[in-house]
């Protein structure tokens, strides 16, 4: 595994058409919205879940690519396995040894970090990659649709409806939304967790393909549209991330409400790129 030696900042742009990209449980599972601006939101937690699911699917049972935060996982049981390892048992600092065991074996721990002090102590890890909430470029229009099902759940319901057997439901969608997420990759933290260049390439692969293994009628058509990567020539970086992100302009070019990615343009001011920073479009 080759060591990560460069700080990286990136812009990830994706869209949704006729779907709910991230439901808000505090609002009846309606699409998340900034209450003051009307802009749509997708949490970092939602995006990291999709990355985890992609890695789990792509890597299967491969050594070093297990997922710590996954469906039905009992986290303290997984931490106990680290303390049962012979090398951890023999270590003078068992907490640090357990922490490194977890980083070595779980992709999402060395990538996103984890708190592992809920049972036997395996310490805490700050992941090499951090993500912001994704925010829509324009305000979104949330639509609620009534839907019907030509069946009922119980005999009692069937008797009540005299055999009509229909139930009603609701489905919330966004007609169209283009979302922008910003990400940060620390080479310094990567060296502490063991996050490697190979892990980074898998992360890019996940961002390109994760929506294709996460299809659901509820989410409509979600697609990765742009992945713009700024690479510094040093571990600590050569320019502030916000200045780099300002070089990326996403502008609406249609007159009415946008309904497709072609209603926008994405440009990069490469002339304004600071010294010792390169930019690459991976999508």
Identify the residue ranges that each predicted region occupies.
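RNA-binding basic/glycine-rich loop and surface signature characteristic of RAMP-family CRISPR effectors
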Residues: 1-283
């Amino acid at each position: 595994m080759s060591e990560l030696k460069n700080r990286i900042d990136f812009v990830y742009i994706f869209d949704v058409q006729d779907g709910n990209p991230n439901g808000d449980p505090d609002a009846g599972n309606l699409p998340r919205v900034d209450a003051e601006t009307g802009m749509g939101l997708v949490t970092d937690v939602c995006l990291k879940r999709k990355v985890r699911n992609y890695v789990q699917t792509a890597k299967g049972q491969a050594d070093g690519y297990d997922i710590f935060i996954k469906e039905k996982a009992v986290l303290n049981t997984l931490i106990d396995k680290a303390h049962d390892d012979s090398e951890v048992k023999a270590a003078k600092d068992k907490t640090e040894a357990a922490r490194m065991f977890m980083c070595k074996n779980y992709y999402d721990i060395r990538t996103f970090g984890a708190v592992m002090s809920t049972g036997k102590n395996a310490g805490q890890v700050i992941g090499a990659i951090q993500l912001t909430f994704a925010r829509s470029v324009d305000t979104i229009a949330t639509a609620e649709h009534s839907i019907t099902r030509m069946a009922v759940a119980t005999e009692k319901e069937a008797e009540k409806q005299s055999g009509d057997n229909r139930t009603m439901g609701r489905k919330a969608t966004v007609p169209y939304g283009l979302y922008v997420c910003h990400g940060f990759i620390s080479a310094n933290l990567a060296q502490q967790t063991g996050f490697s260049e190979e892990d980074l390439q898998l992360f890019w692969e996940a961002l390109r393909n994760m929506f294709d293994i996460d299809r659901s009628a509820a989410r409509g058509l979600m697609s990765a549209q742009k992945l713009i990567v700024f690479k510094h020539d040093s571990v600590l970086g050569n320019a502030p991330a916000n200045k780099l992100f300002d070089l990326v302009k996403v502008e609406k070019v249609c007159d009415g409400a946008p309904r497709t990615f072609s209603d926008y343009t994405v440009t990069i001011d490469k002339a304004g790129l600071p010294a010792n920073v390169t930019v690459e479009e991976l999508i």
